[in-house]
A protein has these predicted regions:
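Conserved, structured core segments of small domains
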Residues: 1-97
């Protein structure tokens, strides 16, 4: 199950969360290494925030990772479910008339 997660941190001075921002990337690295954050797809947004592409087996697994992320940097999270390229191609080829 693919999800694009977009974080918008709560308003604070960037200098007040610098250490936590570093902790977020340290937390994410093992997930990137294990392809839970797919294709090394975690990027900082211009200004503040980050995006990540999660590949998980359940909503519960995603919820666990989001909860861990929020413990490091409190934020509003936008979660967008996605279809894989394989599923998209199969859907399109099955529905061609």
């Amino acid at each position: 199950m693919l999800y694009l997660v977009i974080s918008t941190p709560l308003p604070t001075k960037p200098s007040e969360v610098r250490i936590n921002r570093q902790k977020l990337w340290e937390w994410a690295q093992p997930l990137i290494d294990r392809q839970i954050i797919k294709d090394e797809c975690m990027y900082a947004k211009v200004g503040r925030g980050a995006i990540a592409l999660f590949d998980v087996s359940s909503h519960e697994e995603l919820n666990n990772y989001i909860s861990q992320w929020l413990e490091i940097i409190p934020a509003e999270m936008q979660i967008i479910p996605l279809l894989s390229q394989e599923v998209t191609h199969r859907f399109l080829s099955d529905h061609v008339t």
